[in-house]
């Protein structure tokens, strides 16, 4: 039996995979999608840099790369998240690692749901959705 959502962690950092699964599943379900087959890979900058260069022609690491092969309301795809980039983002935005990991995971799920962030108005809509879902999964630090 195959799992519709498979999470792979290629790093030594421990991740709360059950929480990440809940986040991805919730976002996609609430956006009107079912997961047919989804692979989530949490990796380091070296791996995501290689993927970014090979598949997108960008010669630098990034926080997330999403590939969607979906048709209709069934999600078929994969996403890669660099935990190194998540850590850098967390420092830059002065938030905890776990909160930034949730945000980037939500961001990846939203890409799979069809949201884009290439234009300013798309980015604003994406950030609003991220904030909406983030409130549900992250307790704000004081």
Curated annotation (Swiss-Prot):
It comes from the Bacteria. Zn(2+) binds at residues 107, 111, 117. One of its GO terms (molecular function) is metalloendopeptidase activity. It is found in: Cytoplasm. SUPFAM superfamilies: Metalloproteases ('zincins'), catalytic domain. Binds 1 zinc ion. Single strand-specific metallo-endoribonuclease involved in late-stage 70S ribosome quality control and in maturation of the 3' terminus of the 16S rRNA. This is Endoribonuclease YbeY. It comes from Chlorobium phaeobacteroides (strain DSM 266 / SMG 266 / 2430).
């Amino acid at each position: 039996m195959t799992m519709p959502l498979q999470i792979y962690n290629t790093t030594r950092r421990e991740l709360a995979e059950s929480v990440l699964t809940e986040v991805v599943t919730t976002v996609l379900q609430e956006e009107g999608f079912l997961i047919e087959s989804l692979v989530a890979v949490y990796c380091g900058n070296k791996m995501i840099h290689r993927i970014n260069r090979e598949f997108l022609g960008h010669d630098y690491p990034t926080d997330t790369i999403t590939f969607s092969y979906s048709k209709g309301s069934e999600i078929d795809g994969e996403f890669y998240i660099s935990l190194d980039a998540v850590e850098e983002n967390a420092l830059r935005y002065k938030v905890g690692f776990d909160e930034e990991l949730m945000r980037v995971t939500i961001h990846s799920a939203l890409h799979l749901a069809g949201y884009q962030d290439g234009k300013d108005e798309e980015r604003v809509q994406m950030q609003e959705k991220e904030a909406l879902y983030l409130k549900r999964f992250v307790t704000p630090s004081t």
